[in-house]
Swiss-Prot record:
Primary localization: cytoplasm
Subunit structure: Monomer.
Residue positions binding substrate: D21, F22, N23, R36, H59, L60, G61, R62, R120, R158
Residues where ATP binds: K209, G297, E328, G355, G356, D357, S358
The protein's name in its UniProt record: Phosphoglycerate kinase
Organism in which the protein naturally occurs: Streptococcus thermophilus (strain CNRZ 1066)
Chain's gene name: pgk
Length: 399
């Protein structure tokens, strides 16, 4: 990576500003999945071990008005982080700027940590965080000693005050270990893969992944399509899809992608269908691609799993983004499980999950430790797979 990293700067005695991604699910004040906190620990610990004073920034959820602050405080995160680090994490509830925060920052000693309250609390008054308000970025930068570490891959595709804004106002803006690893795994897989390179794309909408499909058709040897967007591709070919999800305004796009794919684009050949999305009374497999009238496809079928298994045989690089079906429902998770099985059994394969629902599927279904890398950022990984430059990365200091 052509950007400076946290190992390239002197940290001892310095107040080091760190953008982490602590946007974790919180229910009734309890964190239900702490993976993102765990993922940030190597960078935080390194700063503390080097004698730095870590000042952490993160958002949590969306905050547009005062009422949205309810349940969005980073207080539970501060407690969880303190337990993981085995030391106190200083935190002032509700405070993102002002004399109280400045006093707490200036009182930090070497090896100590402070977590600033949810950066999106600044969005209540004019979206200052999300719109990268110059004054806010400059203010937050002033809290440190000229060093900013961006370790939040999950927001690297956004230009916010807490990443791009701070970067513009410090002497050195560098990458943390998580950001460095995310870029290395995903960019390397797409730009310089060991072949055969197979990409697997699922999820519900073609519209979300047009750019990704176009880029991967150029870079990958095969692109497998599953999930709800299958049926837009089916309908584009005149195949009956019953009541399945379809994007009518993307039929021409789907048809064009198929025509220019030179056979690289591989679609399912059967589905598991039900007579309703939720309160269904009948579930069955289709004979072929066509979905029966009154039914909708909610997973790929056994013939498709076998076809994808064959397509993955011998693969040395696999990038997967998007489940094959409604994996949250046990009736429609066989396709996602079948594809995961097909990926992880390949000898010596570098297997990468591009965050989002695919990551949730791997974690919830017990496959997390079988993949080479699971990205912490769905949107950011999608933009990397599309070949786009990430603002949060572009803002870092060149080596």
């Amino acid at each position: 990576m052509a950007k400076l990293t946290v190992k390239d700067v002197e940290l001892k005695g310095k107040k080091v500003l760190v953008r982490v991604d602590f946007n974790v699910p919180v229910k009734d004040g309890v964190i239900t999945n702490d993976n993102r906190i765990t993922a940030a620990l190597p960078t935080i610990k390194y700063i503390l071990e080097q004698g730095g004073r870590a000042i952490l920034f993160s958002h949590l959820g969306r905050v547009k008005e005062e009422a949205d602050k309810e349940g969005k405080s980073l207080a539970p995160v501060a407690a969880d982080l303190a337990a993981k680090l085995g030391q106190d994490v200083k935190f002032i509830p509700g405070v993102t700027r002002g004399a109280e925060l400045e006093a707490a920052v200036n009182a930090l000693e070497d090896g100590q940590v402070l977590l600033v309250e949810n950066t999106r609390f600044e969005d209540v008054d004019g979206k200052k965080e999300s719109k990268n308000d110059p004054e806010l970025g400059k203010y937050w930068a002033s809290l440190g000693d000229g060093i900013f570490v961006n370790d939040a891959f999950g927001t690297a595709h956004r230009a916010h005050a807490s990443n791009v804004g701070i970067s513009a106002n410090v002497e050195k803006a560098v990458a943390g270990f998580l950001l460095e690893n995310e870029i290395a795994y995903i960019q390397e897989a797409v730009e310089n893969p060991e072949r055969p390179f197979v990409a697997i794309l699922g999820g519900s909408k073609v519209s979300d992944k047009i750019g990704v499909i176009e880029n991967l058709l150029e870079k990958a040897d095969k692109v497998l399509i599953g999930g709800g967007m299958t049926y837009t591709f089916f309908k584009a070919q005149g195949i009956e899809i019953g009541n399945s999800l379809v994007e009518e305004d993307k039929l021409d796009v789907a048809k064009a992608l198929l025509e220019k794919s030179n056979g690289k684009l591989i679609l399912p050949v059967d589905s598991k269908e039900a007579n309703a999305f939720a309160d269904y009374t009948e579930v069955k497999y289709t004979e072929g691609e066509a979905v029966d009238p009154g039914f909708l496809g909610l997973d790929i079928g056994p013939k498709s799993i076998a076809k994808f298994d064959e397509a993955l045989t011998g693969a040395k690089t696999v990038v997967w983004n998007g489940p094959m079906g409604v994996f949250e429902n046990p009736d429609f998770q066989a396709g996602t499980i079948g594809v995961m099985d097909a990926i992880v059994k390949q000898p010596g394969v570098k297997s990468i999950i591009g965050g989002g629902d695919s990551a949730a599927a791997a974690i919830n279904l017990g496959y997390a430790d079988k993949f080479s890398w699971i990205s912490t950022g769905g949107g950011a990984s999608m933009e990397l797979l599309e070949g786009k430059e990430l603002p949060g990365l572009a803002a870092l200091t060149e080596k």
